[in-house]
UniProtKB/Swiss-Prot annotation:
Flippase activator that phosphorylates DNF1 and DNF2 and which is involved in the generation of phospholipid asymmetry in membranes by the inward translocation of phospholipids and in the retrieval pathway from early endosomes to the trans-Golgi network (TGN). Also phosphorylates the N-terminal half of YPK1. Involved in pheromone-response. Residues 778-861 form the AGC-kinase C-terminal domain. This is Flippase kinase 1. It comes from Saccharomyces cerevisiae (strain ATCC 204508 / S288c) (Baker's yeast). Present with 752 molecules/cell in log phase SD medium. It is a peripheral membrane protein.
Amino acid sequence: MAGHHHEHEQERDHEQEHEHDSLQRPTTGSERTRSISFSKLLTRSWKRNASSSNNMSVSSVNLYSDPENSRESDHNNSGSEGQSSRFSKLKSMFQSGNSSKNASAHNSSQSSLEGDSASSSSKLRYVKPMTSVANASPASPPLSPTIPETDVLQTPKMVHIDQHEHEREHSNCGSPIMLSSSSFSPTVARTGTGRRRSPSTPIMPSQNSNNSSSTSAIRPNNYRHHSGSQGFSSNNPFRERAGTVRSSNPYFAYQGLPTHAMSSHDLDEGFQPYANGSGIHFLSTPTSKTNSLTNTKNLSNLSLNEIKENEEVQEFNNEDFFFHDIPKDLSLKDTLNGSPSRGSSKSPTITQTFPSIIVGFDNEYEEDNNNDKHDEKEEQQTTTDNKTRNLSPTKQNGKATHPRIKIPLRRAASEPNGLQLASATSPTSSSARKTSGSSNINDKIPGQSVPPPNSFFPQEPSPKISDFPEPRRSRRLRTKSFSNKFQDIMVGPQSFEKIRLLGQGDVGKVFLVREKKTNRVYALKVLSKDEMIKRNKIKRVLTEQEILATSNHPFIVTLYHSFQSEDYLYLCMEYCMGGEFFRALQTRKTKCICEDDARFYASEVTAALEYLHLLGFIYRDLKPENILLHQSGHIMLSDFDLSIQAKDSKVPVVKGSAQSTLVDTKICSDGFRTNSFVGTEEYIAPEVIRGNGHTAAVDWWTLGILIYEMLFGFTPFKGDNTNETFTNILKNEVSFPNNNEISRTCKDLIKKLLTKNESKRLGCKMGAADVKKHPFFKKVQWSLLRNQEPPLIPVLSEDGYDFAKLSSNKKRQTSQDSHKHLDEQEKNMFEERVEYDDEVSEDDPFHDFNSMSLMEQDNNSMIYGNTNSYGKIAYTPNSNRSRSNSHRTFFKR
């Protein structure tokens, strides 16, 4: 037997030397490192037999050993260790062959005992043979005060063998060593020496001993170490299982046993002092001056599976986490309504797909016992935090909590049993449990009744969709594609105050107005219904409203309100302080700008046209008069009365590689042609004059005319009259003045845009993508156009140009009576009553014009100031804009 014993000792020495290199040094509670998850070390068969509990396992291991005991221990063990190791090496030299045979025979017998679960798991290591406590093999000193030697996990099939050996050991040893119930300084038998360790010295394993347990932790009386090698008597198989778990992993020697590895019987005995009224504190620390690791552990690092991810913890009290003032007459065992200790230790079946987010106490449940395929998934969700279990509830804010407990807010893998503890003495929580809806997970779990978190923690009720009133929309508004952006009209003509006239046309006027309620400035376009009926422009205003309401682009004006009265239509739009871009060109001496500035404005116009084409709209009226300057200096397209929407527009196609993605905008209006003769005569495309119909390519023709006018100050085909202008457009080729300051790429772009054959014109194939690929726009950052510095900034100034006076020259004021009539007419415009959509009859020609307000208004609208000279604009150069061609700045031209 002695030879056989030393043969196994030799093999275990080699194995321990190999395992020692792979062991990780346990960290203190303040270090933030990842620790080993207990659920990852358990096999499936062990996991199915583990039971969940509300019990708390406290491990009080002291890292600072007693110097006297450690020196004496080293002295006693040094000689025996050397003698044993020399004898083992000498023995192996002569009996190497016999040792191999015995080792293989022992491994085969051990494998037969462990069964399939041990053979299928790669995480199980060699299990030490069970020996008697009376074994007098010498114990070696510990490797380090903080590095306990890990033992191996035993499968559930080995539990009954462990119990049999354990009972035989106790029968041979006589009376076991028991802990005093009056002291929390445990005394643990030390094999081979009969010496007792002091509470300040951590119990470390013996490297060369055959004891089945390698780690022992100092625990209170209620938490005895159930390892067979320590000589504790136990007739409870569940307690023996918990002892095997404690002895199998060094992690739990410091952190305590997880609740899902403990049985309900441990919980019952743990609560016994309180049930008997003995007055012994359940979670009192050992009578040692040195704090244990569990007391100095940083609670802010706790997370799922004890992985310290710096998860924040909200603490409601600043006192010690453990409570010490629990009433003696309170039986925590009686308050655990939902504890597994009341019934079977079998884990409940959780059918919830994802872990619940629980506020307050936490506990862990295991997966269904028969559902093996979800074991590995549930291992990631199993938690090992036991510090918030078994709390004595008191009233706090009308809910059940303990006055000296720091309640963390953290995740839990399932609905906690600790919540039942808090709700056991709270009438509000019990009533909330009764009124819980059928959608609760408890309805799907037989025998489980877990209240929602808000039943015992006061929380603000979550807002429901029904709490927010749905915006009012008329039946006609709900049928429009832009109905999600607007609601029924919130303003009227009386809500605005006229500041001055900005411009006028054949069917209406544009006023600068101030909203009385918000003091914001807008541009209000007022159209006469009578004039529109006479000129047959009803469809035009409906198209303009649809484009303005549908568009959401930085280079297209924003529509805030649109409504109608008995005589007028109103379009309340964003006020562009810079006025018409045509006016800005007219303020220049040569009526033109340099090539770099023209490239900037042309690129923004191209981006706006691309957006309109994506929506299926053809602008058809691009000219400097319809381009407005925002207060930031960027352009804004307006006046969409001549625009038209292509019928049966197709979805745009994205082409190109990842580095150069292009959007085919021509397909949005592909196949659509219109014969309308619209546009300004100098900007009309040749196909419009011919009357054969036109497509979206007319917008690229007008872009070429616009770039030409920005560079040279006049249009390329202008004649003395309309007929001569049309003749030049149809027959003459574009020519450039003798000006070498215009680059070749710029001239090439203009020529390709002004190609008379629309099928060969630039942009006829892929729309805006063809234009943006031209070398003229090579350095343009299309995605950052809105953030680029514009060439000039409009500023309100008394010395600026008064555009209202310029436009007044077009008025026909033949007499003073007509002037009074105009004033009276403008006054009536702001006194009309709004007609809502439901009030307009179906036979009304303007019944499709919606009275609506934008739901989310832009706060960047200008605020009215009395000192501002609205209408008088001065243009200042932007000093932040870099110019490569400085000798031809905006003002020099």
